[in-house]
């Protein structure tokens, strides 16, 4: 499955989002990780029959499409919010967000 973001980049977004209580990017990142796990499971699942193989391929194909959509979603979110696309660092404006909300 093609990946735009590696696990370290996604984890960095999750870590920063949790520290600064900015849950939306973290939720998208967690969904991406879950889709990767589902895909890997389907690719390694036992195929005891042609029907099993078809079921697993169908789920894997749908998961791959969903993964692509969610990675594009993450890319757009990071662009909209102004995250650094090289270091995956949260912008200062978002870091101050929780303080204003209190």
Task: Enumerate the predicted regions with their spans.
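Long acidic/polar interaction regions in large eukaryotic complex-forming proteins
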Residues: 2-11, 93-101
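N-terminal acidic leader/helix
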Residues: 5-42
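Generic signature of intrinsically disordered, low-complexity segments enriched in small/polar residues
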Residues: 8, 23, 42-44, 86-91, ...
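Residue-level detector of solvent-exposed, low-hydrophobicity positions
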Residues: 17, 27-29, 46-48, 90, ...
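Secondary-structure edge/capping motif, primarily at the C-terminal ends of alpha-helices
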Residues: 17, 42-50, 77, 81
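Generic L/I/V-rich hydrophobic alpha-helical segments across diverse proteins
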Residues: 32-35, 42, 56, 63, ...
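Beta-strand/loop-dominated core regions that host nucleotide or nucleotide-derived cofactor-binding catalytic loops
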Residues: 50, 54-57
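Amphipathic alpha-helical binding modules
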Residues: 60-102
């Amino acid at each position: 499955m093609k990946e735009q973001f590696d696990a370290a980049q996604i984890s960095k977004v999750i870590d920063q989002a949790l520290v600064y209580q900015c849950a939306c990017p973290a939720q998208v990142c967690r969904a991406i990780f879950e889709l990767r796990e589902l895909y890997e499971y389907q690719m390694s699942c036992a195929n005891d029959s042609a029907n099993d193989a078809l079921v697993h391929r169908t789920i894997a194909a749908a998961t791959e499409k969903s993964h692509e959509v969610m990675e594009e979603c993450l890319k757009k979110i990071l662009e909209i919010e102004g995250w650094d696309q090289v270091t995956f660092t949260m912008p200062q404006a978002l870091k101050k967000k929780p303080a204003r909300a209190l």
